[in-house]
Amino acid sequence: MTSPLLRIMIDAALAAGEEIERIYAEGCAAEEKLDGSPVTIADRHAELIILERLARDFTDIPVLAEEEACAGRIPELGARFFCVDPLDGTKGFVARTGEFTVNIALIENEEAIAGVIYAPDPRLLYYGARGEGAFRAEHKVEAEPIRVRPRPATGLIGVGSRNHAAPGTEERNARLGIKDYLPSGSSLKFCRLAEGAADVYPRHGRTMEWDTAAGQAILEAAGGRVMVLDGDAEAGPLRYGKIEDGFANPNFIAWGG
């Protein structure tokens, strides 16, 4: 049974997804933000919808949202806040790959404890929360539970970005024992681990908290974990609310089983 809080997060993601679908069908151009990343009218419209939905039901929980944060509008964050990426994978949206998502997470005491990821094309929903498990629902089909797969002794399946391969990726993959590689865009990489389609997602390169929070919550609810990397060594779970770092993440590795 889905908790009321998670249900509201799901409804907000679906509403934002509907607006993204509408704009996707019409087509739109991307602009460049100060950090060089792309943004479209779909990002902005979707974020407004999510902010309005969450504010209606959770007046006491602040929201860290990507476009607001990039514009310098950062609320005072307490121990509990929402972390939102209204359109993760804007490059995929503009290129019409279908690999873009709406990400909404709830953070509590620096940990991602609940998350929703919605892919408007092909209308695929993932969600999960601590103590509730993780689920996947296709369009108009009842949700089914998902779980990471047991880690194989050899021949790991790795997942990673189509657009952001860091220098040394092939060498690191070899050290991890990755034999097959599943390229994937946006936060869907975490979903591939959570549903047992892949085993490991090493990330060396720029990500922000809103890129990873929902995916981490879903993956951990499915039995996986996300760990900070210090070189090749794991150095504790990935945490949130890193305002002193501009909400940027360090290198990390996400594991399925």
State where each predicted segment sits.
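Residue-level structural signal for beta-strand termini and adjacent loop
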Residues: 69, 97, 118, 131, ...
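Glycine-rich active-site/cofactor-binding loop and its immediate structural neighborhood
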Residues: 78-122
